[in-house]
From Swiss-Prot:
Keywords: Ribonucleoprotein, Ribosomal protein
One biological process term in Gene Ontology: translation
Gene: rpmA
A GO MF term: structural constituent of ribosome
Organism: Pseudoalteromonas atlantica (strain T6c / ATCC BAA-1087)
Gene3D superfamilies cross-referenced by the UniProt entry: 2.40.50.100
Name under which the protein is recorded: Large ribosomal subunit protein bL27
Length: 85
């Protein structure tokens, strides 16, 4: 006769895999065309000069140069640009 009740099941114990979002190249860093600058959900950062935007809102460099972050416009939006070196 068992003197302890059998362990029950639980509904916890799951979590989704992290998506590795965020800034990949910071202001002042040199980049090559095609380098990913920011991975994001939605447009937390907007594409500035010499920047492309993917269907998942990833920002990437269209030309070689240095990364530049700036806040501009009436809504204080964050823009990322590539400035020629």
């Amino acid at each position: 006769m068992a003197h302890k009740k059998a362990g029950g099941s639980t509904n916890n114990g799951r979590d989704s895999e992290s998506k590795r979002l965020g800034v990949k190249r910071y202001g002042g860093e040199s980049v090559l065309a095609g380098n990913i600058i920011v991975r994001q959900r939605g447009t937390r950062f907007h594409a500035g000069n010499n920047m492309g935007i993917g269907k998942d809102h990833t920002l990437f460099a269209l030309s070689d140069g240095k990364v530049q972050f700036e806040v501009k416009g009436p809504k204080n939006r964050k823009f990322v640009s590539i400035v020629a070196e």
